[in-house]
A protein has these predicted regions:
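Bacterial N-terminal signal peptides that target proteins for export
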Residues: 2-11
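C-terminal motif of bacterial Sec signal peptides marking the signal peptidase cleavage site
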Residues: 19-23
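Exported/periplasmic ABC-transporter solute-binding proteins
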Residues: 24-56, 60, 75, 94-95, ...
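A generic structural motif
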Residues: 62-69
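Short, high-confidence coil segments that cap the C-terminus of an alpha-helix
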Residues: 64, 86-87, 209
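Surface-exposed patches in mature extracellular/periplasmic domains of secreted proteins
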Residues: 67, 110-112, 174, 276
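Ligand-binding clamshell of periplasmic/extracellular solute-binding protein-like
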Residues: 69-79, 87-102
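Acidic, polar ligand-binding/catalytic clefts
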Residues: 96-109, 114
């Protein structure tokens, strides 16, 4: 009897170990299946809202891919890429930054650039404002303005519009026009120079500044906070083109590069284009 008991005990131990090993293997397989491939997207601040919707739509068919977004001014993002920051896709709010990266060897993956969207600069005020400003021609009536810096695309377009409207002096590089020069041209108005278009939107919608210049797409979902005074004509700003491209990420493995390519293909797809339109972008 003792021998049988010992035998049964030994069998129980062996079975327990086998079950434990099998359980560990299944756990490892489940963990591996849950691991996601990360794609890092550097996108202009004005794309923040629409990108959230795009990522949600993309993940319906690609649950295995995690999109991580870095949103800031296109100039700041370009500098980060030039300095070697890990990035798979760059979505700029202007061609200047993408052109500069294309002029450098080994940054943009050949054949992946798409000049995809068009936007429009707007002059806005906060709801309930008593401003006398009606548009770019009488911006000097504002006591304070929120305007992005010259290295920020919306700031550059604003400066270009002021030059073409005859308010600012013509210059070789409008990006170099300082806020002091703008303030002087507008009769001494207080200028709040913002780091990106999101900061301009916040400054005006919260009433910190009387008027500001943002993109039309930035007014999406802000109808109860922002009032559009003027859609600035393209004749003054030039086209507001958004290019997108895949970046040579030296830290990425082949799986990550493939996932980045799939996401880029989605960004230029007909499905994505309908989403852009919902968020007030035009298709180039």
């Amino acid at each position: 009897m003792k021998k049988k008991t010992g035998f049964r005990f030994s069998i129980a131990i062996i079975l327990g170990i086998a079950i434990s090993i099998t359980g560990c293997q299944k756990g490892s397989e489940q963990t591996a299946s849950k691991e996601k491939t990360t794609v890092v997207v550097f996108a202009a601040k004005s794309l923040n809202q629409v990108m959230e919707e795009l990522v949600t739509e993309f993940n319906k068919e690609h649950e295995e891919v995690e999109i991580v977004g870095n949103y800031d001014s296109s100039g700041t993002l370009m500098t980060q890429i030039q300095e070697g920051a890990a990035c798979d896709i760059f979505f700029s709010a202007a061609t200047k930054q993408m052109d500069e990266l294309e002029d450098m060897d080994g940054i943009i993956v050949d054949g992946t650039r798409h000049d995809l969207l068009n936007n429009q600069v707007c002059i806005v005020t906060y709801q309930g404002s008593q401003t006398e400003v009606t548009g770019i021609s009488d911006m000097d009536k504002a006591k304070s303005l929120a305007i992005a810096g010259g290295s920020v695309p919306v700031g550059k377009y604003t400066r270009q519009a002021l030059v073409n409207a005859g308010i600012l002096q013509q210059t070789g590089d409008v990006s170099a026009i300082t806020t002091d020069e703008i303030a002087e041209a507008l009769g001494g108005a207080e200028i709040n120079e913002c780091a990106n278009v999101g900061a301009v939107t916040a400054a005006v919608s919260e009433g910190a500044n009387e008027v500001g210049t943002v993109y039309y797409s930035d007014t999406y979902g802000q109808e109860d906070k922002l009032k559009i005074l003027e859609m600035v004509p393209y004749e003054l700003t030039g086209d507001v083109i958004y290019p997108v491209a895949q970046i040579e990420n030296k830290e990425a493995d082949e799986k990550q590069k493939e996932a980045a390519g799939e996401f880029l293909n989605f960004l230029v797809s007909d499905t994505a284009k309908e989403i852009y339109k919902t968020f007030l972008f035009d298709i180039k």
